[in-house]
């Protein structure tokens, strides 16, 4: 595969064809885990990236027969356990926050996409009655910052809805009703750029502190440089951006490495050799 993508990049261009650089995550499972609308405490919009990429094989190879195979499976399970079941609409396919279009400069496409998604969210949330949970911090941030691309009715709808990142959902709505069993020794956090913008880093640290005896946030844990698809197109950007953090992660020798954005997790896994995953997997495992 590396040879094929290298040839394609040479022929078509490095801005259009991603470089195959292992470890690459496997594809996500087809379809979403079953959920029901009656009695749901929130609408769950799985981010596109978590509908594309599945869980790393390292996360599934830890000798845990109950390990969820996808982030939606894990979030659905732990929400139900906390007595706050979430509902994934059956027509969720095709919904997107619009961030990929914005990042590429396709402003008309971004406006069309986010207006369509806000209309869907308004319908799914019963006119804003239910909060909406999103499982990737960049997507949460993108949707919350989308007002300028919305028409007037949809801008009002977005303002009337409660949009929650999975970090806030877990810290404020799930954790108080969960019982943590045996804690791990240490958890290493990578705070994302969008999580920083949303003010979620403290809540992520609070979640980690409930699950681990020691929480480590490397001093050099700033932007991972993956920036959507840039890390696929130019992996050297992410490698350079994470070099300092990678050395500190190695010294920390953590038992788990957690984050809240899939592409950041891919970049950090490549940089450190450690399996970075959404914090939701650890929360689900330690509260069974």
Can you describe what each PLM-predicted range is?
Residues 1-288:
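Iron-sulfur cluster-binding electron-transfer modules in prokaryotic oxidoreductases
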